[in-house]
């Protein structure tokens, strides 16, 4: 399992990055979600790595 936490605001981000955050379910700062570890989730995290913290 991977835990992803939004630590920076998405204001000023590109629309693609906003869509990725929506798909991950991260809408507010300090919002945290758990996901299965797979390539799709890793790719989404890579798109917004400057906005989130990842722990395993």
Swiss-Prot record:
Q: Does the keyword Ribonucleoprotein apply?
A: yes
- Gene Ontology process terms (BP): translation
Q: Which UniProt keywords apply?
A: Ribonucleoprotein, Ribosomal protein
According to the UniProt entry, its GO molecular function terms are: structural constituent of ribosome
One Pfam match = Ribosomal_L30
**GO annotation, cellular component aspect:** large ribosomal subunit
Q: Which residues form a coiled coil?
A: none
Highest taxon of the lineage = Bacteria
NCBIfam families, sorted? rpmD_bact (TIGR01308)
- How is the quaternary structure described? Part of the 50S ribosomal subunit.
Query: What protein family does this chain belong to?
Result: Belongs to the universal ribosomal protein uL30 family.
Q: Which HAMAP family match?
A: Ribosomal_uL30_B
Protein name according to UniProt: Large ribosomal subunit protein uL30
Gene name in the database record: rpmD
